[in-house]
């Protein structure tokens, strides 16, 4: 299992890919971990970009099996149960939402609500 430090390093790498692409400031990106979600197309597409890179979702659709694997390999042990519970609660939260950026934002908010140990790059 990986350490908290390794997790944060990986998260920074992911963020560096998606942030410039969608012109998201550090303030807006950091606010996510406090439950503040910007209501802009750019932000929602940034979230979609991150979920894609993390292999949690592909174009706004949850990749359940892949996500479970990611939880096992990418997270420290003390975070795994909370992330599994969040995934379980949210796997179909954005079902039927056509716009993948919109769908990603719905998923993110659901994960935040259903996972007490929520962290996002």
Swiss-Prot record:
CDD domains: PBP_GOBP
An example Gene Ontology molecular-function term: odorant binding
Any GO BP annotation: olfactory behavior
Subcellular location: Secreted
InterPro entries: PBP/GOBP, PBP_GOBP_sf
One GO cellular component term: extracellular region
UniProt KW keywords: Disulfide bond, Olfaction, Secreted, Sensory transduction, Transport
SMART domains hit by this protein: PhBP
SS bond list: 45-101, 90-110
Keyword Secreted belongs to the record: yes
Biological role stated in the UniProt entry: Present in the aqueous fluid surrounding olfactory sensory dendrites and are thought to aid in the capture and transport of hydrophobic odorants into and through this fluid.
UniProt record similarity statement: Belongs to the PBP/GOBP family.
Protein name (record): General odorant-binding protein 72
